[in-house]
Amino acid sequence: MEAVVEPAIKTKKLSKVFGNRRAVDNVSIEVPQGAFLSIFGPNGAGKTTLLRVLSTLSRATSGSATLMGVDLKEDPDKARDHIGLISHNSMLYPDLTAEQNLMIYARLYGVVDPEARVLELLEAVELKHRRLDVVRTFSRGMTQRLSIARALIHDPDVVFLDEPYSGLDPHAVEIFDDLID
């Protein structure tokens, strides 16, 4: 008998309402594991709101959603173990070093051998030479590269990207694409 493989993301009639405004309206999708999905639309169309609901930063008003088989309403903490999020908000601590920032997240997620993983990712995003510098001294592009490393620190099953190329130069876009593949 074949094992059933849960979709990476599955939603059914997912909605998010703010007052009288439906930011997300009855979205039903199924994304298989290993797939890429892009959502395009004009400003205010609900793309970021959908991402926030799927990444457990906001709760849906109605409908259902699972991530790697985990119901987002029933067990958002367990769902977060599967999620990496790259957003235009860096989620970094500006007064800490690059290395300290990644170590916080590595320990938070229970990464085995966090020191090695931090150095591996700092090298991958070409920031190893700046590992002891505080984040506030970084350019926008460097901060975004460190945010990429932060999102990948625990090798998540699903990575949500909200304007991932924002602030990246062409070389950094190549680095990013290689890491996501």
Features from the language model and the residues they span:
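Conserved ABC transporter NBD signature motif
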Residues: G63-D71, A79
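The feature captures the beta-strand-to-loop junction immediately N-terminal to the Walker
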Residues: F40-P42
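Conserved catalytic motifs of ABC-family nucleotide-binding domains
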Residues: D155
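Catalytic Walker B motif of ABC-type/P-loop ATPase nucleotide-binding domains
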Residues: V159-D162
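Conserved ABC ATPase "signature" region
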Residues: M103, R107-R130
